[in-house]
């Protein structure tokens, strides 16, 4: 997959990913931040994407993993505060 095709696919799933991010976060601003972080991570790891595999599934996995990592970080920080 060339860079143009990758970015075209990335733009095509943005709206759907935003809805998924909102379901995860229940907050518009956090959903936008999660979408942006996911898009940047995908662009940074474009070379790791295997062409002819499920691009949308790959993006959902990145988003879910970022959300889980952020959640764990928040819980860990709250544990230290208490």
Please state what every model-predicted region is.
Residues 19, 33-40, 44, 53-65:
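Structural recognition of an alpha-helix C-terminal capping motif at a helix-to-coil junction
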Residues 7-8, 47, 78-81:
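Pre-signature/interface helix of ABC/ABC-like ATPase nucleotide-binding domains
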Residues 61-81:
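Arg/Lys-rich amphipathic alpha helix in sigma70-family domain 2
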Residues 49-51:
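Short alpha-helix-to-loop micro-motif enriched in aromatics/charged/Gly
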Residues 30, 37, 77:
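Acidic-residue sensor for enzyme active/binding pockets
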Residues 1-19, 32:
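A short, charge-rich alpha-helical start-of-domain segment used by transcription regulators
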């Amino acid at each position: 997959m060339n860079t143009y095709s990758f970015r075209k696919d990335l733009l095509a799933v943005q709206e759907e990913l935003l809805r998924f991010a909102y379901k995860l976060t229940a907050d518009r601003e956090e959903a936008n931040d999660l979408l942006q972080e996911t898009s940047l991570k995908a662009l940074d790891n474009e070379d790791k994407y295997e062409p002819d595999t499920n691009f949308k599934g790959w993006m959902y996995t990145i988003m879910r993993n970022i959300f889980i990592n952020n959640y764990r970080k928040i819980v860990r920080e709250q544990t230290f505060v208490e």
